[in-house]
Amino acid sequence: MTEQTVLALITCQTYPEPSDNLKTLAACLESMGVKTVFDAWQNHPSVPFLLPLCAWDYAAEPEAFRQWLEHAGQAGQCFINPPELMAWNMEKTYLCDLAERGAQVIPSVFVPLQKTELADILNQQGWTEAVIKPAFGQSGKGVVKVCAEALDVNMADYP
C-alpha cells in the first residue's frame, strides 16, 4: 500500500467510537504508512479499502448491511474479506452449509419462522436441550438455552 492509500476501519452508528484495540490496529497500520480512518458503514465511506471489524449493529439491519456490501463492491472498493463471504456469514444458516460440506460444527438446525414446534424439532433430533439463536445476531443477544421438559420460548421472537 502506498502513502496515499486509505483504509477505513468500519464501525457502526450504534457504536461509532473505535475501541482501544481498533485504535491500536490503526496506529500499527499508520506506522507502516497506511492511512486509516474510522467510519460507520451506514455513512457509506468512499475510501478505496474497507475493513468492517466493528459493524456490530448489522444484525438490526441485515438487508441494509448486505446492500452496503454490494454497493461498495460495485463501486470498486476493496474489502479484506470478499463481500459475498461476509454476506453469507451474516446469517447463522452458514453453519448448516458448512456441515453439508463436511466441516465439523456444532449440530445445527435452521428453523423457518413458520415452523414453531420446538418440541418436535428437539424430538426429531434426539436432543433433550438446545441453544436457540436468532438467524442474524452476535454477542449472545437473543441466545437462550432450552430443555425439552420446559419449553417456554416463543419462536416468533427469532427472525
Feature map (PLM): residue ranges:
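ATP-binding N-terminal substructure of ATP-dependent carboxylate-amine bond-forming enzymes
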Residues: 1-80, 85, 93, 117
